[in-house]
Amino acid sequence: MVKIRLTRGGAKKRPFYHIIVTDVRSARDGRNIERLGYYNPVAQGAEPRVVLDVARVDHWVGQGAQLTDKVRNLYREASKSQAAAA
């Protein structure tokens, strides 16, 4: 089964997450199929908090991929921000 989930990066006490497509059997920071965007929970000022390729997420969901709860919330946030920007 394929999931769209977060993988952690960044430094100690400065988390940064990549939003990836991966097999459920892979480790959290292990091998991925495709990188779809990123999530920066400690963004400041004009830095974007969520950058996500919504079209690719729709593609993978159409192929049967499942989103984790956090990624589902980030997807909604990214969709709203893209709609507001357009």
Swiss-Prot record:
It holds the Pfam family Ribosomal_S16. Keywords: Ribonucleoprotein, Ribosomal protein. One of its GO terms (cellular component) is cytoplasm. It comes from the Bacteria. The keyword Ribosomal protein applies. InterPro entries: Ribosomal_bS16, Ribosomal_bS16_CS, Ribosomal_bS16_dom_sf. One of its GO terms (biological process) is translation. GO terms for molecular function: structural constituent of ribosome. NCBIfam families: S16 (TIGR00002). PANTHER family: 30S RIBOSOMAL PROTEIN S16, SMALL RIBOSOMAL SUBUNIT PROTEIN BS16M. Belongs to the bacterial ribosomal protein bS16 family. This is Small ribosomal subunit protein bS16. It comes from Xanthomonas campestris pv. campestris (strain ATCC 33913 / DSM 3586 / NCPPB 528 / LMG 568 / P 25).
